[in-house]
Amino acid sequence: MDELEAKQKNVRVALSIINRNLSYIFFSNDRFKIDYRNNNYVLLSNGKPVQPSKISQGERNIIGLCYFFASILENQEETTAYTKEYLLLIDDPVSSFDMENKTGIMSFLRYQLGKFLLGNEYTKSIIMTHDLLTYYDSEKMFGELIEASKVKYGGDKPVYKRYELKNKILIPFPHNGRQEYTELM
C-alpha cells in the first residue's frame, strides 16, 4: 500500500512540474493541462477533456519536452537537482509550431537551460535544428547564458561552438555575416 501511495505521489509531483511547464510555454494556466483521474491521464484543453489523437503534433512535442525536463528531476529535490552535471541533448525543439508557440518554447528553453547550465558549470547542452531562425534564437539565448555564467562563475567564458552537417561531415558553422535570406536562395 505504501508503494502505491508513493507512486501516486510521484505522479502528482511529475504532473505538477509538467503542468507548470505547460503554463509557462502557453502563457496560460488553462490552455493545455494534464490531469490524473481514476488511474488515467486526461488531457485538458481550455478546461475540457480532449483525446490524444485530437491534439496537434506541436502540442505533442511540447508535452514531450515538458516530460523530458520533468523526468530529469524524477526522485530528486528540485533545489539540488540542478547542481548535478548533465549533458542535455535537444533535437529540433520548435518544429511543428506556430510563431506564438515558438516564442513560448524558446522562452521555456532559456528558462530551463539557464537553471541547468547555471546550476553546474560542467553541465553541457546541445541543440540541433534545421531551422535557421531557431539557430539564431538559440545563439542569442546561449549568448545570454554565457554572460550569466561568466558573472556567476568568473574566469573564462564557457565554450560555445556552432556546427553544421554538410555532406555527412560536421563542420564549424560560419555564423558571422550569414543571412537567412541568402541561405533560402
Question: What would you call each of these model-derived segments?
Answer:
Residues 88-93, 98:
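Walker B catalytic motif
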